[in-house]
């Protein structure tokens, strides 16, 4: 209690001056240190502000460059996509041309096969493997070959359209990604320190594990463009091939149609000439039959005419057998009567022999008449088949003047096949 009541210590004046001076020096030192820190802080703030502005400006430039680069590739992809869409549309048109062309060959093939079927109904010697049949068979083979080629080309076109659509899908997906990237980078590029909705985000200062390098990005974009270019080139080549196939096959079949038509014309001319010659021979045979029939009638009449003289001679001989006694003489008259009967018998025999020959010849003429009539009917049947059935049916194959590509080349007008 006594200690608590003690008075505080007393200092000397010198101690007071020294203590104050010490406070002055410490305050001066602290102030000086603080001033240096303030100056250093201002310099640091200015430096950091400058660095930040420069860094932000550099980021803005990099974002702008990136936007330009992505926009460049987006334009490349847009161009390729447009070209690919146009090429695919063209291929769809070419596919339609192929389908129409393929369909247009069915009727000519049916006509050709029907002509071959009709010509199997020729009869006799006219059932010949002639030039017409050879050319018809060649025409059928050509049409079958053309249709098989068109089917294969149609399959190639379908596959190319599928590849184009696959490339189109990849381009569209890449374009969507690039559009999203451009939208995002546009937003990032437009941000500034005064923009609303800017804030701190946790765990963003890192490289995403599923991100790709710039080289990989370039390779990916370039690969999509190259794939599109490949399909564009393939599509162009396929269109050229389709044009060539449609044109060449149409020309080949057009020429074969003309060859078949010419073969029909020549074959009909030969058949009609043969029929006309047969008709001429038939007319001559008919004339000869009439002549031979008259000849037979004349021979039969001549034989009949010999009956009177023969009866007279026989009656005379029989009557003279009744002469009495020595009057039954073998006189000259007797011998002449006998000779007359012999002559008559001989002449009748000759007439009958000639009559038999004439009758045989008449039968042969009748057979020849029948054979000629049958052969003419064979020719008429052939002419009917070739001219009425085949050539008339082939008229439904449109004109083959070559002025119109027509359906054989996948044209729009179905009536202009050849």
Curated annotation (Swiss-Prot):
Keywords: Cell projection, Cilium, Coiled coil, Cytoplasm, Cytoskeleton, Flagellum, Microtubule, Ubl conjugation. It is found in: Cytoplasm, Cytoskeleton, Cilium axoneme; Cytoplasm, Cytoskeleton, Flagellum axoneme. GO terms for biological process: flagellated sperm motility. Residues 20-107, 134-177, 266-308, 332-383 form a coiled coil. It comes from the Eukaryota. Ubiquitinated, leading to its degradation. Deubiquitinated by USP16, promoting its stability. InterPro entries: Tektin-like, Tektins. GO terms for cellular component: axonemal A tubule inner sheath; axonemal microtubule; microtubule cytoskeleton; sperm flagellum. Pfam families: Tektin. Its main location: cytoplasm. Microtubule inner protein component of sperm flagellar doublet microtubules. Microtubule inner protein (MIP) part of the dynein-decorated doublet microtubules (DMTs) in cilia and flagellar axoneme. Forms filamentous polymers in the walls of ciliary and flagellar microtubules. Belongs to the tektin family. PANTHER family: TEKTIN, TEKTIN-1. This is Tektin-1. It comes from Mus musculus. The gene is Tekt1.
């Amino acid at each position: 209690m006594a200690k608590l009541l003690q008075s505080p210590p007393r200092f000397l004046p010198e101690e007071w001056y020294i203590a104050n001076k010490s406070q002055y020096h410490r305050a001066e030192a602290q102030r000086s240190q603080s001033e240096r820190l303030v100056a250093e802080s201002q310099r640091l703030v200015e430096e950091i502000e400058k660095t930040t502005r420069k860094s932000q400006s550099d980021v803005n430039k990099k974002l702008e460059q990136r936007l330009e680069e992505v926009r460049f590739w987006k334009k490349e992809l847009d161009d390729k996509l447009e070209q690919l869409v146009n090429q695919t549309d063209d291929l769809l048109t070419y596919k339609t041309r192929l389908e129409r062309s393929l369909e247009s060959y069915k009727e000519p093939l049916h006509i050709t096969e029907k002509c071959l079927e009709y010509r199997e109904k020729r009869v006799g010697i006219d059932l010949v493997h002639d030039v017409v049949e050879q050319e018809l068979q060649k025409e059928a083979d050509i049409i079958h070959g053309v249709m098989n080629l068109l089917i294969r080309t149609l399959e190639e076109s379908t596959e190319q359209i599928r590849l184009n659509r696959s490339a189109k899908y990849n381009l569209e997906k890449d374009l969507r990604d690039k559009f999203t990237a451009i939208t995002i980078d546009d937003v990032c590029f437009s941000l500034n320190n005064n923009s609303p909705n800017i804030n701190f985000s946790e765990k963003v200062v890192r490289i995403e594990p599923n991100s790709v390098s710039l080289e990989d990005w370039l390779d990916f974009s370039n690969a999509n463009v190259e794939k599109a270019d490949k399909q564009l080139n393939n599509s162009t080549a396929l269109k050229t091939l389709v044009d060539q196939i449609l044109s060449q096959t149409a020309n080949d079949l057009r020429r074969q149609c003309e060859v078949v038509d010419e073969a029909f014309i020549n074959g009909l001319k030969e058949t009609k000439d043969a029929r006309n010659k047969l008709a001429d021979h038939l007319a001559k045979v008919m004339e000869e039959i009439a002549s031979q029939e008259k000849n037979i009638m004349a021979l039969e009449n001549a034989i009949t005419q010999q009956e009177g003289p023969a009866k007279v001679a026989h009656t005379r001989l029989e009557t003279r057998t009744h002469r009495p006694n020595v009057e039954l003489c073998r006189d000259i008259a007797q011998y002449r009567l006998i000779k007359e009967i012999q002559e008559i018998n001989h002449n009748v025999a000759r007439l009958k022999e000639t009559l038999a020959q004439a009758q045989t010849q008449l039968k042969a003429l009748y057979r020849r008449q029948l054979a000629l009539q049958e052969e003419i009917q064979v020719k008429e049947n052939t002419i009917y088949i070739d001219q009425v059935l085949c050539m008339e049916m082939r008229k439904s194959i449109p004109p083959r003047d070559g002025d119109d590509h027509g359906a054989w080349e996948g044209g729009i007008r179905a009536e202009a096949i050849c």
